[in-house]
UniProtKB/Swiss-Prot annotation:
PANTHER family: HISTIDINE BIOSYNTHESIS BIFUNCTIONAL PROTEIN (PTHR42945), HISTIDINE BIOSYNTHESIS BIFUNCTIONAL PROTEIN HISIE (PTHR42945:SF9). This is Histidine biosynthesis bifunctional protein HisIE. In the N-terminal section; belongs to the PRA-CH family. GO terms for biological process: L-histidine biosynthetic process. The gene is hisI. Its main location: cytoplasm. Its EC number is 3.5.4.19, 3.6.1.31. GO terms for cellular component: cytoplasm.
C-alpha cells in the first residue's frame, strides 16, 4: 500500500497537515497542507508542494523565490492523518527571510536549540571557503590547507584534555568550543559535514 492510499483523507477533509523539518538540524521549519495531488507531485519532483488554501491551487515552495524545500523523506503518523516531511531547505524557509516560520516564542523571544545553532555555524564556516584569507580567521585557515587545520584540531584536542585534568570547567568549555569550531572547519575542508558524523553515530547506536 502506497503512502498516498494509506492516509485517511476522509478524516482530514482532503487536506493533510504537513510538518516540515530540516533533515540536518531537526529544526521545524513550517506547517503546510497537502491534498493527494500535492503529495503526489512532492513525491515525483522531490520538491515540496502544498495545496494553497488562499490561492486555491498547488503551490511549490520557492516557486518564485527559489527557496525550495528538497525532499529527503516523508513519514505518516500513527493516526494516519499528519505528515512529517524532512527536507534540505535551499535558502530561508520563512517569507520574512528567517530559516524557520517558528523563530519567536510566545513572548516574542528568539530561541535556537543547540544543534540548530551548530548547523547554522557550519553553514557560515562553509561559506568562508575560497574567501580572501585576510577577511577572516576561518578563511585564512582554509587558505593554509589541510595540514594546518589538522594541526589546530590536534592542538585544541590536547588543550581540552589539559583543561579537564586540571579541573577547570570554565576553561574546558572554552577549549571544547575551540575544538568543535576547528573540527567543523576540517570536515568542511575535506568535503564532509556534521551530518556525516551524526549519521555514523546513529549507525553505531543502532547496531
Amino acid at each position: 500500500m502506497s503512502l498516498v492510499t494509506t492516509i485517511n483523507w476522509e478524516k482530514v477533509d482532503g487536506l493533510v497537515p504537513a510538518v516540515i523539518q530540516d533533515n540536518t538540524s531537526g529544526q521545524v521549519l513550517m506547517l503546510g497542507y497537502m491534498n493527494k495531488e500535492a503529495l503526489n507531485k512532492t513525491l515525483e519532483t522531490k520538491q515540496v508542494t502544498f495545496w494553497s488554501r488562499t490561492k486555491e491551487r498547488l503551490w511549490t515552495k520557492g516557486e518564485t523565490s527559489g527557496n525550495v524545500l528538497e525532499l529527503k523523506s516523508i513519514n505518516l503518523d500513527c493516526d494516519q492523518d499528519t505528515l512529517l516531511v524532512k527536507v534540505n531547505p535551499v535558502g530561508p524557509t520563512c517569507h520574512l527571510g528567517t530559516p524557520t516560520c517558528f523563530d519567536n516564542d510566545a513572548e516574542g523571544k528568539q530561541e535556537q536549540p543547540a544543534l540548530v545553532f551548530l548547523h547554522q555555524l557550519e553553514q557560515v564556516l562553509a561559506n568562508r571557503k575560497g574567501a580572501d584569507p585576510e577577511s577572516s580567521y576561518t578563511a585564512s585557515l582554509y587558505a593554509r590547507g589541510t595540514k594546518r587545520i589538522s594541526q589546530k584540531v590536534g592542538e585544541e584536542g590536547v588543550e581540552v584534555a589539559l583543561a579537564a585534568t586540571s579541573g577547570d570547567k570554565a576553561e574546558l568549555v572554552c577549549e571544547s568550543a575551540d575544538l568543535i569550531y576547528h573540527l567543523i572547519v576540517l570536515l568542511q575542508d575535506q568535503g564532509l559535514s556534521l551530518s556525516d558524523v551524526t549519521e555514523k553515530l546513529q549507525e553505531r547506536h543502532n547496531k
